[in-house]
Design a protein with these regions (language model features):
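Anchoring transmembrane alpha helix of integral membrane proteins
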Residues: 1-82, 160, 322-323, 329-367
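Hydrophobic alpha-helical transmembrane segments
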Residues: 2-21, 30-34, 60-67, 85-109, 141-158, 205-209, 212-219, ...
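Hydrophobic transmembrane alpha-helices
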Residues: 36-40, 71-72, 160, 232-239, ...
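Juxtamembrane membrane-interface segments in integral membrane proteins
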Residues: 46-54, 76-154, 167-168, 173, ...
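Membrane-interface starts of transmembrane alpha-helices
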Residues: 53-65, 117-124, 183-186, 226, ...
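Hydrophobic alpha-helical transmembrane segments of membrane transport and translocation systems
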Residues: 265-367
């Protein structure tokens, strides 16, 4: 018996609202659990390699995978923290430079338009003291990307170990919990999710390296101080669509304006716009692929809802969660339309983008 469209839609919406409410209540546990799930899927091929090729027992392969993950995370955080510390040490000097530049600008305006300067400068001074005096909060935002407490990392590492060690048991449970007739489709969905998650995370890592490298090189050529710091920050925050590069670009433009003048800050702004266009139209399609692409409407909604539910970590997790949801909807009878509306409209006649790098190397857009 097929349910009427209104009943089916109402059922889906009720399930989504109920699930969303439960997710909000359990964000302290579910946020690190979801992060650990993503990392476990990424490290599963490495663990399988250790077990099949090197004959490692399950526990030992899990430990080696865990150590590799810790080394990667510690390396990234150590590098970023040291760079952030150098930047934080110069914030008082930056405040003085900003005040000097603004004062000269206001002075010229005052002379031309006879506007009282003292009250404006007092207001600006208080604003800068509040903004730059809270450097700990600024760095806390960039360094505490996933959570404001250390419990997130502790929970994540524990969940990562358990999920990776019991991955076959969890996989068997996910299959056996359904009726026999549905198991082939469930297995197909799980395999697709694994493939898409690995493709997405590896693509994000490549995107982080490419965008961070391009921005660092661009700022270094312009002579901007802390070019590497701003490049890494841009690559890291670029994981958050639209908002990430806007935030990091705004910081870089303000810094360039305060230290190098208006002309160079305009060049930096134009450069960020060009880099974003390159990232959206060349880097993202080739390193991530269209199957993970979520349209702008649902990306923005996902960012807003994710931030309201889980804070900053929710903004990071919103896109992979929507990608998983999209795959599930596309493979369930009657819910295909929900999966289609989340993604892009795909034209059957549209050809994949190709770029001839060399005679033997061709860069082709991923599915």
């Amino acid at each position: 018996m097929r349910l009427p469209f209104v009943s089916k839609t109402a059922s889906v919406l009720i399930c989504i609202i109920t699930l969303g409410y439960l997710v909000i209540l359990g964000h302290t546990i579910l946020s690190p659990l979801f992060f650990a799930f993503l990392m476990a899927v990424l490290f599963t091929p490495f663990a399988n390699l250790l077990e099949r090729k090197l004959r490692f027992p399950r526990g030992l392969s899990t430990i080696f995978s865990f150590l590799l993950l810790v080394i990667c995370l510690v390396g990234v955080f150590y590098f970023f923290i040291t760079q952030s510390q150098h930047f934080a040490d110069d914030l008082p000097k930056l405040r003085i430079q900003i005040m000097d530049v603004v004062e000269r600008g206001y002075l010229s305006i005052t002379q031309e338009m006879n506007i009282e300067l003292s009250q404006q400068m007092d207001f600006l001074q208080k604003g800068l003291d509040k903004l730059l005096g809270s450097s700990g909060e600024i760095l806390g935002f960039t360094l505490s990307i996933f959570s404001s407490t250390g419990l997130f990392l502790i929970y994540s590492m524990l969940f990562f170990i358990f999920i990776l060690n019991y991955r076959r048991l969890l996989y068997k449970f996910a299959i056996d919990v359904f009726d026999e007739k549905h198991r082939p489709k469930v297995e197909k969905i799980i395999m697709k999710i694994q493939k898409i998650i690995k493709q997405y995370i590896i693509g994000l890592l490549l995107q982080f390296i490419l965008v961070g490298g391009i921005v660092s090189a661009f700022l270094f050529v312009l002579g901007i101080k802390y070019a590497l710091f701003f490049g890494i920050l841009t690559g890291l925050l670029n994981v958050i669509p639209y908002l990430g590069i806007t935030f990091s670009g705004g910081m870089t433009i303000v810094f360039a304006w305060a230290t190098n003048g208006v002309d160079l800050s305009i060049v930096v702004m134009i450069g960020y716009v060009v880099i974003h266009i390159i990232d959206a139209n060349i880097i993202l399609p080739f390193v991530v692929g269209s199957k993970v692409k979520i349209n702008a409407l649902f990306s923005f909604l996902g960012l807003i809802i994710g931030e309201k539910m889980w804070g900053i970590s929710g903004m990071f997790f919103s896109i992979p969660f929507l990608a998983i949801l999209k795959i599930i909807f596309e493979n369930i009878d009657g819910l295909e339309a929900w999966g289609q509306i989340i993604g892009y409209e795909i034209s059957p006649r549209k050809q994949k983008k190709k770029y001839q790098i060399t005679k033997n190397i061709v860069l082709e857009e991923l599915d």
